[in-house]
């Protein structure tokens, strides 16, 4: 505001902020080292140059640790996708009471196609899905430059004539979205552009606790966002007395390997971690469930 140069100025009010505390879910996958596997030839082992049991034991230990870390990373991915697509993370498991982390995503950022607006009900030669996408993107708190979708969304989009006419395959490999996908060829497919909007199909899967394979991102979901909106993964303290004693409570992962005496003695491998993805600004994402 304007004021007289002869009058003392007013102190401006600082911008406010809000803080909150969350309790991350705790993980500690565990495997037993089977001694019978140390006396048998392992996969990839040369029959003419067999390794000794000590080598095989170390290979079992490192292999199990690798699997445990991969399982933890898969859970981080699951948490991140759920945070963006539902606005919440549900934490439940053995020995803990179920609780919810609410990221307070605005209601307009979670969209489900209603009757009359469903893409499955539209004329494939006349309907313009690009107009719908622009309306969805307007709900985000910033301009969208990337659209990540499940396989069903991509198949539906390609069925519209107007989409095929404007879909751009020719642009070079310079976008942040495309570079981010470079090493994820098995589960991520960069399809091209729709104007300035990078199009990515994500088909990553994980194995649930009941042994069934499930998609991280459901095939009928699309997510609009901006590649400059980056979150982070926070980690809770390692809740293990050995970690406390050695000053390792702030680690991302805390691997353990020990032998329990007995008849017979049993050896275990375990990895502790308490990860929780934090959306930087969740209102800048829009999720749409197509029908």
What are these model-derived regions, one by one?
Residues 1-47:
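Assembly/oligomerization interface modules of large self-assembling protein complexes
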Residues 68:
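RNA-binding accessory domains that recognize and position tRNA/RNA substrates
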Residues 77-95:
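Short, glycine/acidic-rich hinge or "gate" loops at secondary-structure transitions
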Residues 97-178:
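Extended, solvent-exposed, turn-rich assembly/linker loops in the middle of proteins
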């Amino acid at each position: 505001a304007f004021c007289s140069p002869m009058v003392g100025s007013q102190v401006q009010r600082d911008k406010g902020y809000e803080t909150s505390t969350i309790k991350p879910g705790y993980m500690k996958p565990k495997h037993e080292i089977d001694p019978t596997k140390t006396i048998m030839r392992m996969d990839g082992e040369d029959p003419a140059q067999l390794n000794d049991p000590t080598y095989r034991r170390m290979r079992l230990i490192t292999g199990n640790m690798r699997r445990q870390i991969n399982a933890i990373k898969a859970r981080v991915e699951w948490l991140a996708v759920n945070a963006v697509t539902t606005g919440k993370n549900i934490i439940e498991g053995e020995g803990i009471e179920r609780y919810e982390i609410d990221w307070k995503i605005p209601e307009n950022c979670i969209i489900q196609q209603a009757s009359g607006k469903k893409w499955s009900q539209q004329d494939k030669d006349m309907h313009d899905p690009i107009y719908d996408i622009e309306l969805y993107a307007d709900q985000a708190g910033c301009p969208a430059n990337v659209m990540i979708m499940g396989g069903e969304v991509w198949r539906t989009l390609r069925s519209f004539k107007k989409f095929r006419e404007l879909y751009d395959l020719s642009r070079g490999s310079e976008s942040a979205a495309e570079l981010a996908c470079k090493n994820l060829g098995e589960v991520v497919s960069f399809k091209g552009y729709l104007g300035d909007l990078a199009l990515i199909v994500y088909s990553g899967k994980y194995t649930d606790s009941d042994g069934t394979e499930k998609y991280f991102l459901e095939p009928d979901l699309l997510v609009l966002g901006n590649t400059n909106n980056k979150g982070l993964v926070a980690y809770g303290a390692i809740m293990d007395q050995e970690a406390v004693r050695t000053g390792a409570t702030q680690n991302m992962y805390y691997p353990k390997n020990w032998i329990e005496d007995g008849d017979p003695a049993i050896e275990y491998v375990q990895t502790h971690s308490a990860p929780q993805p934090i959306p930087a600004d969740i209102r800048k994402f829009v999720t749409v469930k197509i029908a």
